[in-house]
Amino acid sequence: MRIITFSALACAAAILAGCVTERSYGQAQEIVRGSPAARQDAINKCAMGVNAGSASRRAEIARIINVSPRSNVGRTYCTRAFNGIASGRITYEDFRKRSPQFIRVVQGR
């Protein structure tokens, strides 16, 4: 069980990290949809990654998602994104292309 949980979280956290296949996106979507604890872990890992980035990158993300650069940009972005993925508001294609729908969701609209 522990190995499955670790790999599930790794899959979910990888969603916002880069190249993701449609299959792995679907797997991660089901994980974060069905497990609030797994979603929170994925958000935490994602936020740490965003917050570890450069100040200019965080400022750019803050502008896009309409928050102050002094706020917890990573947590806001990742929470909105993973909630959108879990709810189905962000599809694989939206995610892959960073579509207007993806942007609306991470902006909190």
Where are these regions (language model features)?
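Bacterial N-terminal signal peptides that target proteins for export
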Residues: M1-A8
